[in-house]
Every structure is written in structure tokens, then in C-alpha cells.
């Protein structure tokens, strides 16, 4: 305080002020400090000092033609003296004001497009809600997070090619745009940025923000998706947090979230099929997430999650070298071990064959809600330092570490038999048996473990067998810490192999991942996941099976139509109709099938009775083994929404509704697609137009082979005959004309002849 008072007194004397303001600085050290090097040492001061001058700015000489010498108030805007050392003009800051007010204006249309990520960020903040501030200890752990909301997931190289193609299309250099996303983005951006006057370099920077994922290794407590990370500085400090709900979502977070859900669903479904690996690959290749192919997303998206990594491994992609156990990611930070098979007896005298890891090792364990450091020797836990959000999370981590340690007292704590099975009803391996057992009830494990007195160490406390904190005693080797353990920061990826049962191993044969590690958590995906594989239709329940079955028929209508008329049995046996059978009441399946097949046969026999909508509607019912009966049905029942709903054979119903005006089909109120051909148009327009250049000779003639679809006609040689399936399911015999005739007469004759051939 004394010194401050003294200073105040000194400053009140005018002499002190004079010395400080008037004295020249001539101390060599100071001069050196401020003049050596090109780097500005005091930018703020320099700016103030420069702006205090009359003409601190230089401009191109052309400015003299574009700006008056004086503004409305008569103040001088530019000086006639040249800037020393360049041929530029000295300009006053007032010139900038004049330019901003009166200078030429350009179109602003491109700004929101180029600076899209900024405009969107402002929108999210504007519509976001900030809640109360809470003061409490923050357990932050460093995680690799996405800091750039709203980006696509291109690799740096792919993005570079897109940017060059969009911003500098005439530059030399090979650019290969191969992936679908590259082509789509390039096309979109070229259209958006036509006649864009913004500096190309700026456009390139902004495009990079939009195309490439940027990650940083940051301390985070709470949400890790990019819309939370962009406000990290507003939502968490060292001892406080502010509640926040983002005012919008961004596609990249949605992709990450939906990818995890799709991968989990696919792994779970693959596990129960006859060949898990083949099924998994089939599903990954036929699934789309938000309109993008899942395999393309897997190749580009760095998300590390157990199910996602299993899918990546199946595709031959590299994954992180850490391994997963009990939902925690383990990364060995030091030590090494060798594996040996050993037999042990549980407390229930059941024999377990366990692969024991012999040797001293240290691991970090990172989970969603708890993290830990584990030091262990052969079948012995030396030390476990845990931190977590709450008692429950800490307990989860302790159980996993105790099982992982393979200690004898853990194995002896087992009561009852271990017979846990996976989804495919196969027994789990011994380590997962133990894990499941103690996850259900760990009381005996904690009680048998033993406690020890503890020293007072800053930031650490003990935890008792009933999971309450203590400063005197703790579970043997276990401590709870206030600070979290950082996630493994390296982005290194390794080559792995995967076996038929989806167990992923590194090159030394260590199991990194297996389906047992895939979380059972169910979530709702943010983006639409379209599982084209019929194996996945059951995933979202009966409604999804219904919608997907009809969507599949409509998507493949061209081929379905031909099979329907030529080879119905093959069509009825398609695997795509299997899930549908579970919706049809057991007792009625055979009868419905017999009825529908008979109806279809009648349509084939009587020309002109073909009815697209009816075939699509009834086809799935024909897949069950038919019962021959004379029964007729006016409606068929399907079990959806917890009860039987009716599909009307000759009309619309809430389950199956075809709108003639829009030509669209809705199934249970969901759009199932459009019929490309009009089922009600008789046979006139479409066919006559398509059959240009063909003569219709009459009804189908089997000698000329199976019916072709209209698209296949183009392969016929002149004068060649063929049966062709026209829109209404009728088959007629045609011949390719020998000469190119007038289109008009062709269409008219075609129409007449189709009518004659059919009637």
C-alpha cells in the first residue's frame, strides 16, 4: 500500500508527468527490444500511435479517381504526397468512413453462402438457451473433440481437390473427384458461387471449414458434440458450469450419432445370423444414413465406438490400437505381458478356463461417465485411481478393473453358476461371464476385496465397500481422485483382423473388440437410417417391416413385374418377404397365400385384368406356403400397432393407401414411393410412345422366349421378334421395324394393335 501511495503522490506532481511524457527513450536495450526483428512488439500501442497521425493508411493510386478530396464537412480525405517507399497514396481514416457510406455497393447474395458456418453459428447461439450457472468442482478430462460444427467428412486430400475445382477451376494440376460426396459438393458449390466476388482465398478457407473435420484434444466435462464444444468457453470453467441447450443441430453431430446407432443395430443383428461377418458386411453395404452410403461414412468418419470399429475392421479399415472391456476403453501406457491359459475354481466350484496376463502393466481406462488409471501385476491389482460423475459411475469402473485384474478373491466371490449367453444363445467367454455376474451384483466382490488404512494425499480420498467416501479407509489399492484421466490422445490407427464371429484382433493376436462389448443402449437416430437389407427391417418393429416390404417392391417393380408373370414361384420365395410373414396371423397365412396366388393366376390368364396396385398390395401374402381352399377374402389382416389392421383387397385402407392423383403409395401414413407407370391409364400413351419403331404382331408367342421389359427391347436387331411385357402386365409379340418410320403413324398403329392384341 505504501508504494502505491507514494506513486500517487509522485503522479500528482506535474514534474513527474513531464519527465514521463517528454523524456526521449535512449536506453540501447529498450531501443533494441522495440526495433529488432520484423515482429511488432506492442501492436496495440503501434495502432494507437499510427491512427493518431493524419494519414495512417496507404491506398492504390486509383483511389484518387474514386474518392473526392474532401468530404461533406470539408475534411481532407487523401494527401497529395506519395507514401515513401511505394507508389501508393496516403489516406485519412475518414476516407474509410466515406467509402463505407458512399462507395460502390456489390451484391451481398454470396456472403451467407460463403460464410455459411458463421451464419449458422450465430443462428445456433441466437436460438440457444443459457441456463443457470452452478458452482461445483469440474471433473474435466481431455477428449479428442470435433471443434468445427457443420462440416462434411472429407479427408484433407479430398477437400483440397474439391476446393481447387470450385475456387480455381482453371489452375493446372490433376484433380480426381471420385467419391460421391466430392462430386455432389463440387456441383452444389459451383452453382452457389457463380459470379462470386469474394476473394478466392477467403472462399477457399471457408470451404475448408465446411468440408473437413477439425479435432482438438480439449478438457471437457459434459457434452462432446461439436455444438457444445463451440461454446466450451461459455459453459465450463474451473469451478463453475453454465447450463446450455444449443439452438440447432449440425449434420456432422447427427452423422456421428446416427452412425453409432446404425452400427450397433447391425452388429447386434449380425451376431444372431448364421454367418455374422458376411451378414454384417451385407448390411453395412446396403445401409444409408441421411442419404449417404454407410460404407462411405465409415471410411471418412473418425468416430471411435465399439460397434463402429467392428464395422470398420470388417471393411479392412484401420482402427485405434486401444481395446475395449466392460464398456471402457483401455490403453496400455507401460509394461508388457504374456498370455497363458489357466483353470480356476469359482466360489461355486465351477471351473473357468481363463487366459491370464502375466507381467506388470499400466492402463488408462476411459468410459463415458468415469475414468481411471490401473496398475496391475499377474492376477493382482496394485493400484486403481478412479474419478467419475457419481457413485454409480465410479462403482462401474471399479467392478471392471477388479474383473480385469483376474485376482483370486474376485473369482472366489462368484456365487451361483455362470451361464450368461449372447444374443445368439452362445455362452460368453469366461471374462465376460465374470463381468456380467458382478455387474448384476457386486456386493460380495466388494466385501471380499478387503480394505486398508490410507494416507492423506491431496485430491484423493478412499472409498468403502458400500461405495461411500472415506478419508481413513479404502478398498485395497483403490482411491478416488478429483481430477479425471485424459482420454488417449493419439490418432494412430493399426491394421487389425476380424474373424467370422466379429472378434477383432491386433497383429499380435490380442482381442481388441468383440460383439459382447457393443452397448445395448437404444437411442433414436437424428438422421434417417435406411437399412435396405431385409435383415434389418424388423429392427424398428412391425410398422417398419410393412413399410420396407412395400418400398422394396416399388423400388424393384420392373423386375418384380417380369418375375410375377414369368416365374412367380421364384418371386414368392424371395428373402425380402420373410419378415412380413411374422405380421400375418399364423392361422391365416396359408389361406391368404392360397387365395392371393389363385387371384394372381387369374390375372395372368385373363388379358387386361392386370392391376399394378393390387399386385403390389397382395404380393407379400403370397410368400407363405399356400393352402388350397375355395375361400375368398375381401380384406386381409396384419398385426401392427398392437392389434390386427385390415388391408382391403379391392380398395384403400389406412394400412395401404394408393393416391391416384399423386400416383404415390402411403403405408400406415408413411410415404412408400411412387409408381412410375400409371396403373389406370389403359394401355394407350406410355406403351405406344415406347414401342416406337416396333410392330405389334399379336398375343404372346412362347416360341420367342420369356417376355422382355420395355427397356430391354433396344437390344433387338431389325426384323427380330420378341415378347414384351407392357405396362399393364400384358404380354404381346412385337417385331423391330426394318425401316425407321414416322413416329406418329407408329404410335397410332401401336395403340390400335395393343387394343386388338389384348381384347
Swiss-Prot record:
Annotated positions for site Avian adaptation: 627
Main location (coarse class): virion
One GO term of the biological process aspect: viral RNA genome replication
Motif (Nuclear localization signal): 736-739
Cellular compartment(s): Virion; Host nucleus
Gene Ontology molecular-function annotations: RNA binding; RNA-directed RNA polymerase activity
Pfam families: Flu_PB2_1st, Flu_PB2_2nd, Flu_PB2_3rd, Flu_PB2_4th, Flu_PB2_5th, Flu_PB2_6th, Flu_PB2_7th
InterPro entries xref list: Flu_PB2_2nd, Flu_PB2_6th, Flu_PB2_C, Flu_PB2_CAP-bd, Flu_PB2_middle, Flu_PB2_N, INV_PB2, PB2_helical
Similarity field: Belongs to the influenza viruses PB2 family.
Free-text function comment from the UniProt entry: Plays an essential role in transcription initiation and cap-stealing mechanism, in which cellular capped pre-mRNAs are used to generate primers for viral transcription. Recognizes and binds the 7-methylguanosine-containing cap of the target pre-RNA which is subsequently cleaved after 10-13 nucleotides by the viral protein PA. Plays a role in the initiation of the viral genome replication and modulates the activity of the ribonucleoprotein (RNP) complex.
Quaternary structure (record): Influenza RNA polymerase is composed of three subunits: PB1, PB2 and PA. Interacts (via N-terminus) with PB1 (via C-terminus). Interacts with nucleoprotein NP (via N-terminus).
Protein name per Swiss-Prot or TrEMBL: Polymerase basic protein 2
Gene name tied to this protein: PB2
Amino acid at each position: 500500500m505504501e508504494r502505491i501511495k507514494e506513486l500517487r503522490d509522485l503522479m500528482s506532481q506535474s514534474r513527474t508527468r513531464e519527465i514521463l511524457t517528454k523524456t526521449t527513450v535512449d536506453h540501447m536495450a529498450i531501443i533494441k527490444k522495440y526495433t529488432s526483428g520484423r515482429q511488432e512488439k506492442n501492436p496495440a500501442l503501434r495502432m494507437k500511435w499510427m491512427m493518431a497521425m493524419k494519414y495512417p493508411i496507404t491506398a492504390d493510386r486509383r483511389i484518387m479517381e474514386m474518392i473526392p478530396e474532401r468530404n461533406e464537412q470539408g475534411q481532407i480525405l487523401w494527401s497529395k504526397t506519395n507514401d515513401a517507399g511505394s507508389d501508393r497514396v496516403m489516406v485519412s481514416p475518414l476516407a474509410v468512413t466515406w467509402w463505407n457510406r458512399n462507395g460502390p455497393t456489390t451484391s451481398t447474395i454470396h456472403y451467407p453462402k460463403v460464410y455459411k458456418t458463421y451464419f449458422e453459428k450465430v443462428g445456433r447461439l441466437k436460438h440457444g438457451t443459457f441456463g443457470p450457472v452452478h458452482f461445483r468442482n469440474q471433473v474435466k478430462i481431455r477428449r479428442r473433440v470435433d471443434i468445427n460444427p457443420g462440416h462434411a467428412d472429407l479427408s484433407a486430400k479430398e477437400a483440397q481437390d474439391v476446393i481447387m475445382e470450385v475456387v480455381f477451376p482453371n489452375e493446372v494440376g490433376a484433380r480426381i473427384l471420385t467419391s460421391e460426396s466430392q462430386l455432389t459438393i463440387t456441383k452444389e458449390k459451383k452453382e452457389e458461387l457463380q459470379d462470386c466476388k469474394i476473394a478466392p482465398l477467403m472462399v477457399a478457407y471457408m470451404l475448408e471449414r465446411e468440408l473437413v473435420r477439425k479435432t482438438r484434444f480439449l478438457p471437457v466435462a459434459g457434452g462432446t458434440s461439436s455444438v457444445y464444444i463451440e461454446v466450451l468457453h461459455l459453459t465450463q470453467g474451473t469451478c463453475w458450469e453454465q447450463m446450455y441447450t444449443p439452438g440447432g443441430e449440425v449434420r456432422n453431430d447427427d452423422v456421428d450419432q446416427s452412425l453409432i446407432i446404425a452400427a450397433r443395430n447391425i452388429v447386434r443383428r449380425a451376431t444372431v445370423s448364421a454367418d455374422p461377418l458376411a451378414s454384417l458386411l451385407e448390411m453395412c453395404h446396403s445401409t444409408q444414413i441421411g442419404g449417404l452410403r454407410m460404407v462411405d461414412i465409415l471410411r471418412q468418419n473418425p468416430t471411435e465406438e465399439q460397434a463402429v470399429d467392428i464395422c470398420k475392421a470388417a471393411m479392412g479399415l484401420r482402427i485405434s490400437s486401444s481395446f475395449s472391456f466392460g464398456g471402457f476403453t483401455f490403453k496400455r501406457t507401460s509394461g508388457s505381458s504374456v498370455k497363458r491359459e489357466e483353470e480356476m475354481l469359482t466360489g461355486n466350484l465351477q471351473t473357468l478356463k481363463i487366459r491370464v496376463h502375466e507381467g506388470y502393466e499400466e492402463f488408462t481406462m476411459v468410459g463415458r461417465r468415469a475414468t481411471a488409471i490401473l496398475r496391475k501385476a499377474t492376477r493382482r491389482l496394485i493400484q486403481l485411481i478412479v474419478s467419475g460423475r457419481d457413485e454409480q459411475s465410479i462403482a462401474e469402473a471399479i467392478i471392471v478393473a477388479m474383473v480385469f485384474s483376474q485376482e483370486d478373491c474376485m473369482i472366489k466371490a462368484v456365487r451361483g453358476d455362470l451361464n450368461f449367453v449372447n444374443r445368439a444363445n452362445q455362452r460368453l467367454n469366461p471374462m465376460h461371464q465374470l463381468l456380467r455376474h458382478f455387474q448384476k451384483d457386486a456386493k460380495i466382490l466388494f466385501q471380499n476385496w478387503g480394505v486398508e488404512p490410507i494416507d492423506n494425499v491431496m485430491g484423493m480420498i478412499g472409498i468403502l465397500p458400500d461405495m461411500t467416501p472415506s478419508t481413513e479407509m479404502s478398498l485395497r489399492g483403490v482411491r478416488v481422485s478429483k481430477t479425471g484421466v485424459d482420454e488417449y490422445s493419439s490418432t494412430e490407427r493399426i491394421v487389425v483382423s476380424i474373424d467370422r464371429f466379429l472378434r477383432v484382433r491386433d497383429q499380435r493376436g490380442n482381442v481388441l473388440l468383440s460383439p459382447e462389448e457393443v452397448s445395448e443402449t437404444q437411442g433414436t437416430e437424428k438422421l434417417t437410417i435406411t437399412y435396405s437389407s431385409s435383415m434389418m427391417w424388423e429392427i424398428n418393429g412391425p410398422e417398419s417391416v410393412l413399410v420396407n416390404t412395400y418400398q422394396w417392391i416399388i423400388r424393384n417393380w420392373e423386375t418384380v413385374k417380369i418375375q410375377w408373370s414369368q416365374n412367380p414361384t421364384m418371386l414368392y420365395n424371395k428373402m425380402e418377404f420373410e419378415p412380413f410373414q411374422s405380421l400375418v396371423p399364423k392361422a391365416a397365412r396359408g389361406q391368404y397365400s392360397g387365395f392371393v396366388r389363385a387371384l394372381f393366376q387369374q390375372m395372368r390368364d385373363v388379358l387386361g385384368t392386370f392391376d399394378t396396385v393390387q399386385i403390389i398390395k397382395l404380393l407379400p401374402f403370397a410368400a407363405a406356403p399356400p393352402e388350397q381352399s375355395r375361400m375368398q377374402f375381401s380384406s386381409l389382416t396384419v398385426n401392427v400397432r398392437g392389434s390386427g389392421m385390415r388391408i382391403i383387397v379391392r380398395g384403400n385402407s389406412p394400412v395401404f393407401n394408393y393416391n391416384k392423383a399423386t400416383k404415390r403409395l402411403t403405408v400406415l401414413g408413411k410415404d412408400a414411393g411412387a409408381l412410375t407407370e400409371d396403373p389406370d391409364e389403359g394401355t394407350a400413351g406410355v406403351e405406344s410412345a415406347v414401342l416406337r419403331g416396333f410392330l405389334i404382331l399379336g398375343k404372346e408367342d412362347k416360341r420367342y422366349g420369356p417376355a422382355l421389359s420395355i427397356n430391354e427391347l433396344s437390344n433387338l436387331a431389325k426384323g427380330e421378334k420378341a415378347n414384351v411385357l407392357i405396362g399393364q402386365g400384358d404380354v404381346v409379340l412385337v417385331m423391330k421395324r426394318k425401316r425407321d418410320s414416322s413416329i406418329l403413324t407408329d404410335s397410332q398403329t401401336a395403340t390400335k394393335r395393343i387394343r386388338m392384341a389384348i381384347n
